[in-house]
Amino acid sequence: MFLYWKMRVSIDISSDHIAIYHWTSQKILLERSWVDRELGKVLVNLDREQAIWECLVLNWPWGFTNLRVWTLALNLLKTLKNNQISFFSLSKLELYNLFYQKGWIGSKILVYIGQRLNVWLWDLEWWRLISTVKKSEIDQLSSQYPDLTLDQVYDTTYFEPTISQLSYEFRIDWCYLKSGNIEHFLSRDELTIHPVERLEPNYMIEPNVS
């Protein structure tokens, strides 16, 4: 008898690499430069292996092209599957706000925005952008903001961290945040709070298409 299993996936399209989390402990990392060449093949192979029926997408902040390419590809996959995929869209900052509300991280965070030199200094308590800053200013900022935390990125040389940096992964039913020797867990229900019929690229600013 042939059993056709269904699969929940979580996809981070808001970092320096694309991260696709599937099954209990498997992760696929794609370079940004590979997206247009590898994306379709990866999604189709995953769906053939285990039918994707639910997809949580970390959908902001990041660069215009990759957000657009990924949302279009996932929407196309849903169309090809006769709309048999449930989408949930969550910004990375909303995820970090969940961590903050639980008391797991401080209120100030430096966030990757797809640029080589610049990052966002974001205030989770007041939910606002403090400023766009240069990575070279991190040590100075850490003196000004003692609770400052670095965004998770997959290339550890991007920040060359000298202060605390987030480390989290997704599993089928939860997301876990590593903090030293402690692991904190968010349930899938806490993450899938924004169901959407179609994914829209969640730009941090409007792209210039002129």
Locate each region found by the language model.
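Oxyanion-binding and handling regions
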Residues: 1-37, 41, 86-210
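Residues at secondary-structure transition points
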Residues: 34-37, 64, 68
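Residue-level signal for short, function-critical loop segments
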Residues: 60-61, 207
